[in-house]
Amino acid sequence: MANIVWCNIAMFLLVSLFLTDDAVVVLDALDNVPNNIKNQPYRTGYHFQPPKNWMNDPNGPMIYKGIYHLFYQWNQNGAVMDVNKTVWGHATSTDLINWITLSPAIRPSRPSDINGCWSGSVTILPNGKPVILYTGNDRYNRQVQNLVKPKNLTDPYLRHWTKSPENPLVTPSPVNHINSSAFRDPTTAWFGRDGRWRITTGSQEGRRGLAILHTSKDFVIWKQSPKPLHYHDGTGMWECPDFFPVARTDSRGLDTSFSSGPMVKHVLKVSLTDTFNDYYTIGTYDEVRDVYVPDKGFVQDETAPRYDYGKFYASKTFYDSVNQRRILWGWVNESSPEKDNIKKGWAGLQAIPRKVWLDESGKRLVQWPVKEIERLRTTQVKWGNKLLKGGSVMEVHGVTAPQADVEVFFKVSGFDLEKADVIEPGWTDPQLICSQRNASSGLGPFGLMVLASKNMEEYTSVNIRIFRAGENSKEHVVVMCSDQSTSSLEKGNDKTTYGAFLDISPYQPISLRTLIDKSIVESFGGKGKTCITSRVYPKLAIGERTHLFAFNKGSQNVNVLSLSAWSMKSSL
């Protein structure tokens, strides 16, 4: 696989094509990461980042002729967001891990996108031809929807794209009552039984968030449906909507156009600008009425489940037809001040792509890092059945602590579960529970201290706490935390502590997997039932001065059934 990747790089370095603005073209593989950036302590080793400058939303991920493509919102000119100069960055990969960064696929050049080429999606048409629908910020600063097509379908790297002469395809107006300043991020289209394509686009009417629905026979002329696909009052703007089917009985992915039926549910995800978080609901798509109805217990607002309870936004999925899986991408922003981002010359990265599927309960989605990430594993350290006494800390030796993959299984005895503290009636917000300073209860917090300094002046704690649901209750409440409060001695960083309830039985082994990559910590609890991502910037715990610990701050003992920690190579 490495030989294939290096051959691809060599090929791109030899290519240098110059075409017009409208035929938007790759010149070659972009410059290598400058040494003054590459050697920075917070520059990640195996997460995707462009060579420099600002990156945000993932756009139009797909697989075409065996090559994975990732487009993304990118400011070529600096490490801050500039919506009026945003282009579609472009990268390709054979394995979702090692990426070749190409020149932008779409740049502002027409009246319909002259003030920025914003987010959108790829749709694979029945003839196998990929097309992109994206939002352009036009010369009047209206948000309009545009189409681009690949110029050369025989090129698996899709280096040349051409804008449609019909652009813009959809424009807000007094007639259609679409808010011209809140109409963006069209989804991947799905094909209905009536022979029409459908897309939904995020919007806002007052405080009502909605997913506007359009249909088309030819992918050029789009007609607005009388009703939105879905809406909810009081939520504000719905950015980056994503709508896709999931199988009810197994983890295989489904094509976005897969028909509804008794063995299929649908997911609607929206990114709320009010909270800067992604929320999803699970429900039914009524193909006759062209509306989405969330299942009982789901509401498309801040009470809905989240993909990730940390720093994760503007996410986008795609169907990997080769491996029959649905893959999730998400933007992870910085937690450092803007001045620091400018100084280091870059900002933003993408989370490790995750396979996503419906939990057997039908009440949540499960996420797990794509299996390809395991190819970067090298030296392994293993523990077997170690007792983690209350109040103890144990170092994990023999692994490159700043760049690692750690999976641990904890076990708590039934006797000790009976000694868990009773959760307070008002403790309904897990983030507040996790934010309690110097917390120590009967059971927990226990877990990992990652990106830690030798004497633990700095560390990020990824941990579990267990409570009894009531004084006489045999039920338990499990909370998963990612605590950044002690992550750095630097004063100016965002050190928010994140938390979420983890819907598992504590009588069973409790799994916790954490991907550590210098300034990002991605954690997966309960085999992916709950996920939390953090950005941290230690001053002491850098390079060889970084340590990894298992700990138990509770009063009751916890068993480490197994711990596997791998040093991780950097991706190309």
From Swiss-Prot:
Signal peptide: 1-23
PROSITE patterns: GLYCOSYL_HYDROL_F32
Recorded superkingdom: Eukaryota
EC numbers on record: 3.2.1.26
Keyword terms: Apoplast, Cell wall, Disulfide bond, Glycoprotein, Glycosidase, Hydrolase, Secreted, Signal
Gene Ontology molecular function: beta-fructofuranosidase activity
Reactions this protein catalyses: Hydrolysis of terminal non-reducing beta-D-fructofuranoside residues in beta-D-fructofuranosides
Entry-listed glycosylation sites: 84, 152, 179, 333, 438
Active site per database record: 57
GO terms of biological process kind: carbohydrate metabolic process
GO CC term (a single one): apoplast
Disulphide bond pairs: 434-481
Binding-site residues, substrate: 54-57, 73, 118-119, 184-185, 239
Compartments, record wording: Secreted, Extracellular space, Apoplast; Secreted, Cell wall
Gene3D superfamilies per record: Exo-inulinase, domain 1 (2.60.120.560), Glycosyl hydrolase domain, family 43 (2.115.10.20)
Tissue and organ distribution: Expressed in flowers, and, to a lower extent, in leaves.
Protein family: Belongs to the glycosyl hydrolase 32 family.
This protein's name: Beta-fructofuranosidase, insoluble isoenzyme CWINV5
